[in-house]
């Protein structure tokens, strides 16, 4: 993500770690998020504009979801979407547990020019109930370990670049 970019940041602890790294490394970002913790982390920067989506806050993780959230996200067109999900199957299916969160994530995908997916290795072949979409909707996958040969094949077939990310600094 370059300086001066606009971006969506989705729900999840992975996205909170990404937000902390952005704060350390990037300037003048415009961030729209449905993650109250990512908003809190990034709002510490006076050169950032941080916009929090409207909707219902989930007590468990501070995620904001619902119809109002989807409508809010659909008002924007950003440079990047940085997202995570609960599971990726070898056929490229992206899965999550909350259908309300999935609708918000789909709106983010549809309103971003470049889409990044960040997941740790535990998300590969992890089951979840709701289908978010296909990995082919993303431009690049960032993860902490090399994906399996089957997953690499799917990524290559869909034209999705992938990278093992450097560990998050503390």
What does each model-identified segment do?
Residues 1-24, 31-34:
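Helix-turn-helix/homeodomain-like alpha-helical modules used for DNA recognition
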Residues 21-26, 42, 46:
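Active-site catalytic pocket residues across diverse enzymes, especially alpha/beta-hydrolases
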Residues 32, 36-170:
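Conserved phosphate- and dinucleotide-binding cores of soluble alpha/beta proteins
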């Amino acid at each position: 993500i370059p300086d001066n970019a606009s971006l969506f940041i989705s729900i999840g602890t992975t996205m909170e770690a990404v937000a902390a790294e952005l704060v350390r490394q990037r300037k003048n970002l415009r961030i729209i998020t449905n993650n109250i913790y990512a908003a809190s982390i990034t709002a510490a920067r006076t050169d950032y504009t941080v916009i929090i989506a409207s909707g219902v806050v989930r007590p468990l993780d501070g995620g904001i979801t619902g119809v109002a959230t989807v409508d809010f996200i659909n008002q924007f067109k950003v440079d990047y979407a940085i997202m995570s999900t609960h599971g990726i199957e070898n056929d490229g299916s992206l899965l999550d547990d909350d259908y309300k969160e999935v609708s918000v994530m789909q709106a983010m995908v549809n309103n971003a020019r470049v889409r990044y997916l960040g997941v740790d290795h535990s998300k590969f072949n992890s089951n979840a109930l709701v289908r978010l979409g296909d990995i082919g909707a993303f431009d690049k996958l960032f993860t902490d370990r090399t994906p399996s040969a089957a997953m690499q094949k799917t990524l290559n077939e869909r034209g999705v670049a992938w990278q093992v990310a450097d560990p998050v600094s503390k």
